[in-house]
Amino acid sequence: TMNDVLAALSTVEAFVDSGGPILMVIAAVTCVMWTLIFERLWFYKATLRKTINGTITHWNARAEQKSWNAHQIRTAMISRVTEQIRLNLDVIGTLVALCPLFGLLGTVVGMIEVFNVLATSGGADAKSMAGGVKQATIPTMAGMVAAISGVFGSTIVNQIANRESQLLEDQMTMDH
């Protein structure tokens, strides 16, 4: 029902508020990371086979495949397709690595809040200190969860990319 949806949104909003502004950065990085992972999976599923088959057909249509020039053409064709296969994989890896770093930044920001409360209240305001501790731990957890999920996605797309690149190279023989 609508009340359940509103209650869920309220819970998410409370979680985001308790994690501080760094949590929104982690969420944005995670969204970009998973968008790129899904884009790669879509490319591998929908487009890559046509690209590889077209490249192999073009190579096999060549009358001469053994000369040095043919070898250079083959290498260029493989490189062109491999570049398409590996597009954004480095960006995905970088985003995976950034997630826990932003989590640690959230920890630092939260601990600064704890120390500010400690300095102003002399340790008497435990509730405010707990808010700072929460703000310190939630981004760390979110960054780690995002990074762990990203490692799985990144590993899958990298394995597919490596396999498809190797298969392309194996299928473009030089024996005519």
Identify what each model region corresponds to.
Residues S79:
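Residues that scaffold, gate, or flank divalent-cation-dependent active/transport sites
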Residues I160-H176:
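Cytoplasmic juxtamembrane regions at transmembrane-helix boundaries
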Residues T1-Q65, E83-S165:
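Hydrophobic alpha-helical transmembrane segments of small proteolipidic membrane proteins, enriched
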Residues W59-N69, T173-H176:
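Cytosolic juxtamembrane regulatory segments of multi-pass membrane proteins
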